[in-house]
């Protein structure tokens, strides 16, 4: 996402344009919408250096029924800083809605999108429907980062009605966030 939005953020910072930039994440791994902005390990093994990010804690693991990609406990440092500076907003979406949007996109565009991209597709569709209702004309750009051909098992679960949404409890997130490294200084 950082590379796609960089030119637009530059224009915003220079005061040339105003854009609505939306970061979309899974409701089952909501680092921006429910995480904390803190230093954390970039890996679950706690070997990599610490980075400042919105995080659920490096020990956070989404439910086994999470099939929608984007399993990482934290958000990139760049996107985290932009969110902290209120240069972008964040939304979380449930995986059944993500796969519904992905199938709609595949029917219309002939491309089976990766679940990761389908989070953005879900919100792009929602934004387009708002424009249709309000009559507002808006250019909507999203990142299509890959195909869903490696995710056929997840698509099959969705088609068979076996996919469930999972949203971690506040207690689950609190437990994980409490394990963040303690910064001194």
Q: Which residue ranges define each predicted feature?
A:
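Gly/Ser/Thr-rich helix-start
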Residues: 3-4, 70, 111, 147-149
